[in-house]
Amino acid sequence: VRALGFFLGAVLVAGPAARAQNGDHAGEEQPELPRELVVPAAPALSVEDEAKTFRVPAGVRIELVACEPLVHDPVVCVFDADGSLWVVEMRGYMPDVDGKGETEPNGCVAHLFDDDGDGKMDRRVVFLDKLVLPRAIAPTRGGVLVIAPPRLLFAKDEDGDGVADEVTVVDQGLGGIQSPEWAINALLPTLDNAWYCANVPWRYVWKGEKWQRERTSAAGQWGATKDDVGRIYTNNNSDPLRVDAISGVYAARNPNMGNALGVNLRVVDDMSPRPARMNVGVNRGYQKGQLNGEWKLASVTGACAPLVHRGTGVGDEYRGDAFVCEPTGNLVLRYRLRDESGAVKGEPVRNPDGLDFLTSTDERFRPVWMCDGPDGALYVCDMYRGLIQHRLFVTSFLRKQVLARGLEKPIGMGRIWRVRSAKGERAKAARLDRAEVGDLVSALGSENGWTRDTAQRLLVEEHDSSAEAHGRLRGVAQHSSSSIERVHALWALAGMGGIRKELVHSQRAELQHRWPGGIKDPDTRVQLAAVATSEGLAATDPDVLEDWLDIARNPGGGSGKLRQVMLSLGSVPTPRGLSAMMELLQTSAQWEEIRSAAVSGLGGRELDALNAIADSEEWRKPGPGRAELIALLARCVAREARGDRLEGLIGLSAGKMAATKWQCDALVSGVMAGRPKDALGKPTWIRLARKPGVLPEALDAAFAWPGKAGAEEAKVRDLTAEENARFEKGRVLYEGTCVQCHLASGLGQTGQAPPLRSSPWVLGKD
């Protein structure tokens, strides 16, 4: 091996200069590996030999579930209610180092079955084929949702032969062919009965007997997961774990403000992996800091597919921990999560030998997806190949190694592994496809997250009109001793249209005689779920709204309850809802996350809130955070740039707020912050249709109107035919690739992609 490694090192140095690659940066040097470096060979191994390369903690074992020819190039696997395994095969991914033939329709959805119950798959049925780079699947409503670029499909087997007969296009124009790793993926079932997708600012919900998009904040690159209380976790290649502490639906609902605080938050500060082998085959291994002194990966560069493990099959000490795939480092990382007053933080947990949770000395071990199974174990999709980097980013440095070391072949392999406790026999897998209503409701109390999630899904999808299901779920929501079971029961009822006042609201006298349940539940997690699920009641029922205010005024245990109530008040578009919000803000505006939560629900009503402040004697007094709240509201009105509201804002500054200097100053600062920017990124005019009747001097620099001296509008000419053709080509490219990261608004995503709108780099002359 040493002689072979030396020979390969020599080839890498002496070989002809590779042609420029998509991943090369202009003017960047890519130093060769040292001539004397011994690079271990990386032949394709049998499953038996690959298994010998794994290192896991004592007390944990790894077992084969499926391999070629039952599975090829697996990128996603999920279990259905009957214990069968759905596998998405991206067989067109990188056929060679240049990606030639990548768009051939050779991808498929395979359905694997363990016929004899021994834990290994025995049978493969191709459910759906002739797909281009498919990337996600979710069993639902008797079929499966499949992301097959550029479409989202719903496929169903109607005649029982295991092959899709009925295929419906649910959505299209999704992109994903040009850049597979930067496109919509995941299809994660959420606690609130939706389907979350990474990399795009929407999710899918079943509403009105059809699938619909629902706006949410965008995050993540490949994969998504959730914890027991429904928080969504994502990551990107260089940041192993991020979390939405609040629902992205709340965060994204006011475009005038932008995303509310509390989404896409960093969880992990330590980005270093601990591999078992050198990783010189990483794409930018030539860059300083990419590899350490042992030529091992120093910082994650391929982090993907996070999983919060919610099963019991690996061991109690692992439940609730986050696991992250790192295929470029040939490993799976593990993080211990802790909740610090609503903020989730994670610390890496290493094995006694100093390595990460699951490592391999096989360079072709490529973990790209994980899921929990019906037996409580953790399952890993191993794409098993030498080349994992996509052609859009391959550098000359990597290309040389791929060709010299034969890493591009063979392709079409793949393995799925089970990680479980080494103590005793494998736990029996739950099977819910034939479960009666009572059994499904009981399954909401399972210790395994997969079982709870699947039971909830089946109740919502198949028993939404069942009186028995509604009755049993109400009993669980109010009387179960398990708080997580009560949470699932509430969300199941919400998905079935079964939230009623008596479920979430308790009369004061009743509290002395029975378990309170609902909004007055003793467990914060249940209280938050009760508030969120009762949003449809609060607009018309003052008792429910008063319950919200009670726990917000006396939150206890941190500000989580107050923030949830503030978020939920945004769904009550009534005068009472607004007055309740302003009442709470009188004593809570000092917290930025509370101000943000409030304004997230005031899209189009920011001026109403400002008028409420101006009309209130209590708000005349300055206090912590009050000026910042006024500025934020004014900024939203300025950014929306709607003529009637801008006139109202100007009138407010010249009228009701004029006598209260601190209020007027805050309003002006918000307007100035909300001005649009020019091509150089400098603030410019907010344009009005006509000159306002009264304009405070402090706002003169913010507004322009026809005829204002020095504020003439630039004349815009029509595009030429050639320019229009280029524009259309760019539009298609942006919609197909760039929009996934930079969004349709061009505002980008925190921790993922910088803003392009008003960017000097985009609009400047240089």
What are these model-derived regions, one by one?
Residues G5-G15:
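Bacterial N-terminal signal peptides
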Residues V1-A3:
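Positively charged n-region of N-terminal signal peptides that target proteins for export
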Residues V402-A404, H479, G748-D766:
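Gly/Gly-Pro-rich "capping" loops immediately C-terminal to redox-active cysteine motifs
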Residues A305, A377, R415, A492, ...:
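C-type cytochrome heme c attachment motif
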Residues E723-L747, L763-D766:
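Sequence/structural segment immediately N-terminal to covalent heme-attachment motifs in c-type
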